[in-house]
Amino acid sequence: MTPSKSTKFIREWLRVTAEVPARAVPGMREQDTGPMDSGRKRDGSRSSLVWDVLADVMAARVAESGRTALDVVDVGAGTGGLAVSIASRGHRVTVVGPSPDALAAARWRAAETGVTLTEVQGEASDLPALVGEPATGAAGAEGNGADLVICHNVLEYVDSPEAALAAIARVLRPGGTVSVLAANPIAAVLQRALAGKYAEALAMLPGGVTESTGASATGQATRGQASSRQAPSVTRRFTLPELTALIEGAGLRVGDAHGIRIFSGLLPGAGADLATVEALRELEDAAATCPPLRDIATRLHVLAHRA
């Protein structure tokens, strides 16, 4: 592909993906629909609560370390929407992913925004080799390792969630944070049942097997399951106890947990007018940390920290 054709392809891809709901695009994340700004009004169906949480995490790390520029690694960064937003705040961001096309799109998005990303092709389980491990006691030092690792909509697709989280733990600096966002099987059951798709809902129950992927509804993909580059369907989903167990198994301390898209995931088409959007946003934000509502959200967001 010539440079001019490649440029046109990436521009068109970014235009199309910006117009399609994130869940309709294989491997694409909610944040890839565009840069997020914690100061703008949020669409209740695409809450930027995650961004607000991350902004607080970064601000606390800056204050703690005394460094204005943090080192951030975004695993499975998609087309770079979140990575660019973080880089726009002056932080050094490395995006890691298996797809050269997605990395090229992230590079293009960064150039259009006037920021710089470091793109590295590879898998989450290879992070220590790709970005390096921090030296012992390097909590505030620049160099290898990361202050923050973004792991959003990744664990559903990797061959081994355990290996991915173990690798992430190894690249975190002491006191560093990982932000995990993953699909929730409970929400999948509710959404299908409310849509009248009872057989699909039954298959999505814990211990059931989804028809579209042949994967266990919670935690594990079946033998021979294709990776996210081969199939658009979510291969795994995690309840909050499963997600926290995975994180703790990697030697990390579990922090705050939020439910993302609790009600909007059950109300397709909600938010037709601004008043409804704002009311839904306020409800989503208030319920995000309130169990059991938090625990039925479309996606679960968990922060974890390295000691």
Each model region followed by its residue ranges:
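A conserved beta-strand element that flanks and buttresses the S-adenosyl-L-methionine
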Residues: 150
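Conserved alpha-helix/loop element of class I SAM-dependent methyltransferases that forms part
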Residues: 44-68
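Class I SAM-dependent methyltransferase SAM/SAH-binding core
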Residues: 81-127
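Short alpha-helix
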Residues: 234-251, 257
